[in-house]
C-alpha cells in the first residue's frame, strides 16, 4: 500500500518532464492530485455501491463519514441494517434523505428485546424506523403524548394492539386520523371475553373499532337505538346474525339501509327448524332476508300469492325446488319473470321417474324447465311435432340422443336449426353395429350427424363419389382410416380439401409392413398422408 503514493508521485514527475520537452504548459499539480483522488473514489464507489447502479452515487457520497447507530452481527439481516445503518444504507433511497437525518436525536418509545420483531419495532421505534416513510412524518410526531386505551400483555398481538393502541399505532395511517380521535368517548354495545374474536368485536365494538373505517361513520351511529328481530345463542353464527341482527350489524353496509327497514313488518311464507339452513331461509324468509338485496325488491313481493307446480318432500332439494317452485323461488331472479309465467299451461313431452335426472328433464320437460332460458323460447316450440330418427334404449345416452333425437333436443340450439333439417332424407355411407361408436359414426353417418355442424356442409357432399385408397379391417382404427380413407373422412376438414387431392398420383418413398406403424408411415408415406396437412412437404424437401 505504501508503494502506491510513490508510484503516483513518480508518474506526476514523468508527466511534468514530458510536458516540458513538448513545450506545453505543465498541468497543475493540485488538479492532477484531485483528478487522481476522484478516480480512486469512483473506483471505490463502484466496488461498494455496485458501480453504475445510480447516477447520483457517482458523486462523492456524503454518507462516507457517517457512523452507524449500532452494529449488526449479520450484515445480511435487513431489519438490523434498517435500524442501525439507516443513514448509510437507506440514505440514498430518496432524494430528500441526503439532508442531515432528523432521526439521529429521536428516542424510541420503548425497547425491543428482538430487533428483528417487526410488530415491536412498529410500536416502539415508530418514530425512528418509519419516520422517513412519509413526508409528513418529518414533523414532530403527534403520537408521543398519546395514551393507549388499554394495555396488551403481548406486544405482538395485532388484534389487541389494534383495539388498545389504535390511536398510537394506526394514528399515522390516514391524514384525517391526526385530529383528536372520535373513538375515545364511545362506549361499546357489549363486552367480548376474547378481544381477538373478530365476530364479537364486529358486533359489540362496531362503533369503536370500525368507526374510522368510513367517513360517514363519524356521525352518531344509527345502530345504537335499534332492537334486533330476535336473539342468537351463538354471537359468532353468521347466518343467525344475518337474520336476527340484520338491522344492527348490516345496517351501515349500504347508504339506503339508513332509512327505516321495510323488513320489520313482514311475515315469512313458512318456518324453518334450522335457522342456518340457507335453502329453507331462501324459500320461507325470502321477503325478509333477501328483501334488501335489490332496490326493486322493496315493492310488495309478487311471490306471495303464487302456488307451486308440485310439492317437494325435501325443501332443501335444489333440483325439486327448481322444477316445482320455479315460479316462487326463481321468480325474482329476472325482471321479465314478473309477468305471468308461460310455463303454467305446458304439458311435458314425457314423464321422468327421477325428477333430479337432468338428461331426462332436458328431453321431456324442455318446454317447462328450460322454456324461460332464452327469450326466443317463449314462442310455440317447433319441437312438439317432430319425430325422432330412431329410438334410444337409454335416454341418458348423449351419443344416441345426438344421433336419433337431433331434431328434437338439439333443434333449438341454433337459430338456423329451425328450418327443415337436411338430414332427414340422407342415407348413411354404411352402418354401425354400435351407435355409440364415435369413430364409426364419424365415417358412416358423417353426412347425417355432422352435416349440420357447418353451413357449408349443407351442399351435396363431395365425399360420396370418392373411393378410398385402401381398406381397413378395423373401422375404428384411426391410423388406418387416416391413411386409406383420408380423402373421405378428412376431406371436409378444410376448405382447400375440396379440390382434387394431390395424393392420388403420389407413390410412397418406401413400403411399410405394418400400416399402423406411425413412424414408418411418417417416413415412407409422408407425401401421401401429410401432403394435405402441410403444403411444404415435397420430395425435394425429403431429399
Swiss-Prot record:
Determine if Signal is one of this entry's keywords: yes
Q: Which residues constitute the signal peptide according to the record? A: 1-23
| Propeptide, residue positions | 24-69, 92-109, 132-149, 172-189, 212-229, 252-269, 292-309, 332-349, 372-389, 412-429, 452-469, 492-509, 532-543
From the UniProt entry, list the residue stretches annotated as the region Disordered.
45-65
Q: Which GO terms describe its biological process?
A: intracellular calcium ion homeostasis; regulation of systemic arterial blood pressure by endothelin; regulation of vasoconstriction; vein smooth muscle contraction
Q: Keywords of this protein's UniProt record, alphabetized?
A: Cardiotoxin, Disulfide bond, G-protein coupled receptor impairing toxin, Repeat, Secreted, Signal, Toxin, Vasoactive, Vasoconstrictor
What tissues express this gene product? Expressed by the venom gland.
Got a GO cellular component term for this one? extracellular space
Q: Name one GO molecular function term.
A: hormone activity
Domain of life, per lineage: Eukaryota
The disulfides recorded in the entry are: 70-84, 72-80, 110-124, 112-120, 150-164, 152-160, 190-204, 192-200, 230-244, 232-240, 270-284, 272-280, 310-324, 312-320, 350-364, 352-360, 390-404, 392-400, 430-444, 432-440, 470-484, 472-480, 510-524, 512-520
Q: Which segments carry the sequence repeats?
A: 51-90, 91-130, 131-170, 171-210, 211-250, 251-290, 291-330, 331-370, 371-410, 411-450, 451-490, 491-530
The places in or outside the cell where this protein is found are: Secreted
Q: What does this protein do?
A: Vasoconstrictor activity. These toxins cause cardiac arrest probably as a result of coronary vasospasm.
Q: Known PANTHER family for this protein?
A: ENDOTHELIN, ENDOTHELIN-2
Hey, which family's this protein in? Belongs to the endothelin/sarafotoxin family.
What protein is this chain from?
A: Sarafotoxin
- Identify the species of origin: Atractaspis engaddensis (Israeli burrowing asp)
Amino acid at each position: 500500500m505504501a508503494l502506491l503514493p510513490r508510484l503516483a508521485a513518480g508518474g506526476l514527475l514523468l508527466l511534468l518532464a514530458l510536458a516540458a520537452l513538448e513545450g506545453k504548459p505543465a498541468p497543475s499539480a493540485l488538479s492532477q492530485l484531485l483528478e487522481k483522488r476522484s478516480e480512486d473514489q469512483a473506483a471505490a464507489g463502484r466496488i461498494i455501491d455496485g458501480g453504475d447502479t445510480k447516477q447520483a452515487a457517482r458523486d462523492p457520497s456524503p454518507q462516507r463519514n457517517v457512523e452507524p447507530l449500532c452494529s449488526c452481527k449479520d450484515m445480511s439481516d435487513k431489519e438490523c441494517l434498517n435500524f442501525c445503518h439507516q443513514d448509510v444504507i437507506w440514505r440514498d433511497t430518496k432524494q430528500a434523505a441526503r439532508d442531515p437525518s432528523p432521526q439521529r436525536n429521536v428516542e424510541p418509545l420503548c425497547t425491543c428485546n428482538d430487533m428483528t420483531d417487526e410488530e415491536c419495532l412498529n410500536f416502539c421505534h415508530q418514530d425512528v424506523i418509519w419516520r422517513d416513510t412519509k413526508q409528513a412524518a418529518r414533523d414532530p410526531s403527534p403520537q408521543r403524548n398519546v395514551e393507549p386505551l388499554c394495555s396488551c400483555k403481548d406486544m405482538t398481538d395485532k388484534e389487541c394492539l389494534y383495539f388498545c393502541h389504535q390511536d398510537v399505532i394506526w394514528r399515522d395511517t390516514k391524514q384525517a386520523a391526526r385530529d383528536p380521535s372520535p373513538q375515545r368517548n364511545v362506549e361499546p354495545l357489549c363486552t367480548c371475553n376474547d378481544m381477538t374474536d373478530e365476530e364479537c368485536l364486529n358486533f359489540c365494538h362496531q362503533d369503536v373499532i370500525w368507526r374510522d373505517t368510513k367517513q360517514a361513520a363519524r356521525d352518531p351511529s344509527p345502530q345504537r337505538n335499534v332492537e334486533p328481530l330476535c336473539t342468537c345463542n351463538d354471537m359468532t353464527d353468521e347466518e343467525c346474525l344475518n337474520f336476527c341482527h340484520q338491522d344492527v350489524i348490516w345496517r351501515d353496509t349500504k347508504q339506503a339501509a339508513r332509512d327505516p327497514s321495510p323488513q320489520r313488518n313482514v311475515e315469512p311464507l313458512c318456518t324453518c327448524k334450522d335457522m342456518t339452513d340457507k335453502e329453507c331461509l331462501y324459500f320461507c324468509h325470502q321477503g325478509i332476508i333477501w328483501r334488501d338485496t335489490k332496490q326493486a325488491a322493496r315493492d310488495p313481493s309478487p311471490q306471495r300469492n303464487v302456488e307451486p307446480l308440485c310439492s317437494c318432500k325435501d325443501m332443501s332439494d335444489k333440483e325439486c325446488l327448481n322444477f316445482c317452485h320455479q315460479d316462487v323461488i326463481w321468480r325474482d331472479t329476472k325482471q321479465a319473470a314478473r309477468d305471468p309465467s308461460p310455463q303454467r299451461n305446458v304439458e311435458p313431452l314425457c314423464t321422468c321417474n327421477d325428477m333430479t335426472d337432468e338428461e331426462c328433464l332436458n328431453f321431456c320437460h324442455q318446454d317447462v324447465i328450460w322454456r324461460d332460458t332464452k327469450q326466443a323460447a317463449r314462442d310455440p316450440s317447433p319441437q312438439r311435432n317432430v319425430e325422432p330418427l330412431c329410438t334410444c334404449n337409454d335416454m341418458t345416452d348423449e351419443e344416441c340422443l345426438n344421433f336419433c333425437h337431433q331434431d328434437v333436443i338439439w333443434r333449438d340450439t341454433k337459430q338456423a336449426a329451425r328450418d327443415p333439417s337436411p338430414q332427414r332424407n340422407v342415407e348413411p355411407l354404411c352402418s354401425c353395429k354400435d351407435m355409440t361408436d364415435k369413430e364409426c359414426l364419424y365415417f358412416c353417418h358423417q353426412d347425417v350427424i355432422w352435416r349440420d355442424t357447418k353451413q357449408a356442409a349443407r351442399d351435396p357432399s363431395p365425399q360420396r363419389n370418392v373411393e378410398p385408397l385402401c381398406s381397413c379391417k378395423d373401422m375404428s382404427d384411426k391410423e388406418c382410416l387416416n391413411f386409406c380413407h383420408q380423402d373421405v373422412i378428412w376431406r371436409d376438414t378444410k376448405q382447400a380439401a375440396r379440390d382434387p387431392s394431390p395424393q392420388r398420383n403420389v407413390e410412397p418413398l418406401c413400403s411399410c409392413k405394418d400400416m399402423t406403424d406411425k413412424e414408418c408411415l411418417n417416413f415412407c408415406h409422408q407425401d401421401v398422408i401429410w401432403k394435405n396437412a402441410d403444403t411444404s412437404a415435397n420430395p425435394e424437401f425429403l431429399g
